[in-house]
Amino acid sequence: EAQRRETWDELCDRNVAMHVKRYPQLREEIQRIYRDFVRPKKVLPSMRSLQFGGTPIELSESRIFNCAFMPLDHPAAFHEAMFLLLGGTGVGYSVQARHVNKLPGLTEPAPGTYRFLVGDSIEGWGDAVKILLKAYFNGKSLPRFDFSGIRPKGARLITSGGKAPGPKPLKECLERLQAVLERALARGTGTRLRPIEAHDMLCHIADAVLAGGIRRAAMIVLFDRADEEMLTCKSNLACTMQRTDCINHDAELYECDITTTSNGKDYHNVVLHSSQLAEWKEKGALPWYLFEPQRGRANNSANLLRGAVSQNEFYALMERVEASGAGEPGVYWTNNLDWGTNPCCEIGLKPNQFCNLTEINADDVKDQTDLEERAGAAAFIGTLQAGYTDFHYLRP
């Protein structure tokens, strides 16, 4: 309404008001901490707390946390990831076999169909993913998604700010999720998703979030170091050309049908520049992002158990990283293969745990006493944030 951005003091006022409403008995201490530490930027709350402080967090308290980690060991993990990412929370996830193998086997959807009106909310988008997956994990009928209730592209988002993406990103996401599920089901009823397939599904979900106007989806995936598909999912792909038709002589663009050598997967109508065709003729391979661009939505790291990897095995893995030409995968050293991390790898997280973040500005710390006072203020704010636990859309 004022046609300007929120000031720092206004943002702090909004944050204070939210905490005082939750903890009225701590009003004076909250106001003191913000006056002495947050307003002068000696200590900062979580970034999501600053961004969404007030009504957005009161409606969906998971939004106060910057990041989370979850193993993909339950069908609910997929729609929960959509919900969290749309709310601005980054997601780390595991597609290690020990987790993905706990997903139910796939089954043919039941005959018939029904109309499903997609809700115009982050819960509504999550529900659309949930309903689609129920058809393949639980044998329910496939829905006919009705997107008429979703605000058109460019409409103002009242609660969280920004502009609505319209229904197109979600529609494309659901189509791509279904394509992954159908390809997996072609192996036979009862087959389970491979780690690379579960990973691709999360990346397609992130693509919808990327277009959703909240913020770019932040993700990291952890996988078994022996998983060849995950290890090479950001490497150049050996392939054969089935068709190359010039579609623009001036721009030197060609429309191609391509088959990857590793798994025989067909890609149709891929547009390549003449220089890329020349690269293929020389190397017999093309960059991964021409085939599976959604994989760019996550950082990839092999999960390595401390004490269980020899020096030679580690060097061999690093040679694969160099050969990828993409600088990935990274490695994540751990003492527990069921634990994970947030996308920035700042903290180890248990399954389905949030990262409760505060920051201390160490740039202008004067002495030990000053540092300890800032640490106390940061701990106080972190304790306030830890009390926001009404995760109404997530599993208990």
Q: Residue locations for each model-derived region?
A:
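Extended catalytic cores of very large enzyme megasubunits
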Residues: 1-396
